[in-house]
Amino acid sequence: MRWISATLMGVVMLAGCGENVKFRNPLAKNQPKQQAAPAQTAAKPKADPKPVQTKEAQARNTMIRTTSLRGGGASRFGNGKTVGANSSVEENVERLRTEIAGSIDFAPTMIVWIVDSTLSASELRSSWANGAKKLYTDFQTNGLPGGKPADNLSTAIVSFGEKTDFVIEQPTTNFGEVIGKLAAIQTDNSGKESTFATIGQVFDKYGPIKQQQGRELMVVVVTDEAGDDWKQVDSIVEKANSTGVRVYAIGVPAPMGRMMAEVAPQESRSDGMPAMLQGPETRYSQRVDMKFNSGGFGGDDVDSGYGPFGLTYLAYQTRGSFLVSRLRSAPWPGSAMRFDDEVMRKYPPQYLTEAQYQAKLSENKALAALHQAASQGQVEAMTYPASQFVVEDEARLKNALDGAQRIAARLEPMINAVYDPLAEGEKDRDKITDKRWQASYDLALGRAAAVKARVDGYNQMLAILKGGRKFEDPSHDTWNLEPADTLEEAGSRLEKTRLQAKEYLERIIKEHPDTPWAYFAEKELETPIGWKWVEY
């Protein structure tokens, strides 16, 4: 629905500005050109001596495996260097063969497949069934890896949507029975996904069987979403550790900093929840939701390269993996922009418990401010502001200026709700040591300052014209407000805000090259952060 909101905003902006104003998009000449990939990727840093790792650092380093298990593809950067997030579901099912082999080599193993039965997961589910059929047919024909007897691997299948359904409830070692049930999952049209409740039920049901039979327990979650109840993840991790289970997930990458991508949902819901909940990749979003002046609809989505936080955190806390998959026809991730794995491995999400995450926020005002700013609603861009004012009649000119100023007045509180906490927390910026948090805070403040400078500057420049401004050429009768790299005429306060935006955005480009944060900083800088009057 965001594209509808953006369209309505453009219509509202055109209202109430009087006959003295002519409309055009003053930002149109700054529309971004298609960017080519840089000729070279950043030089690889020299390996540092291995430090003594904390438990948190060990967990995060383990998480980075999420990109190492992915296949080839083309990145925006690196001249087509192969990157991940391009493996098929079937390929990721096949990758689990190695995990199964390692497990049954250690001890007899029970594997429980937890499969998303919702409508949006139809392609994922079909691809999983194809991959699993190939896997189990091979087990049936050629035996288990390492020559292990068939009873060393038992299988159960569970599906979930709004409710949980046990497709193969009693674990079976009959591979033919498993093959026969792969396509037996019924589609759930509710759009609801009780993912973590189902995982908890599986632990409760199969944990005791694991103990009774002396088996290892592997759980594989196959889903295209994050789960409506993903916030249960900390309690589920505790239950997983007490059960002694290794969790894997096969799914799509999370949209960076977003609960859902700006694509048409494949299903609908009536309970107020997003139709498709697929992110973010961090526990909470660390990306402010501000539209770009220079961007089109749906142009802000980025493939994070990581799975949604809850499932990824669960998988790696149990020594499993989240296997990122790309689907052939699903709208997400589709052709969304993605970045080189070698770069993104340096920016893993913070895999912390809820308590640990909140402690980090309480210790640093900049992080707390980022958290607050990223939780605000979307701030629309001032895409088509009035820019040309004909001076024919003072009363009509005043009406036109009043109407134009109402646009800025409407946006101002939304912008301040993002900018003000970030500016207040700036004093703690240099205390941030995590690279992802550094880049996220800098981008948030840089973008918020840029938007504030443009909107407040626009309002102030209109106020200056309203107060009276003489033409240098007496034959001229029109003032045109054009984008410029200055706000000196609007006042020192706004010029300071403009310079603050420029400083933060340029720092991101310098310190975090070839990353999504640098890309968004470049995109923000494509439009000048300021205004000037030109007479005609």
Language-model-detected regions and their locations in the chain:
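Short solvent-exposed coil/turn linkers within tandem alpha-helical repeat scaffolds
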Residues: 209, 228-229, 428-437, 509-522, ...
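Short coil/linker segments at helix-helix boundaries
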Residues: 393-400, 455-511, 516, 533-536
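Acidic, polar low-complexity linker/tail segments
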Residues: 34-112, 118-126
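Bacterial signal peptide processing site
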Residues: 18-20
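C-terminal "exit" segments of structured domains
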Residues: 271-414, 420-423, 427-434
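VWA/integrin I-like adhesion module and closely mimicked acidic/polar interface patches used
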Residues: 225-310
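Von Willebrand factor
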Residues: 104-169, 176-222, 227-231, 253-260
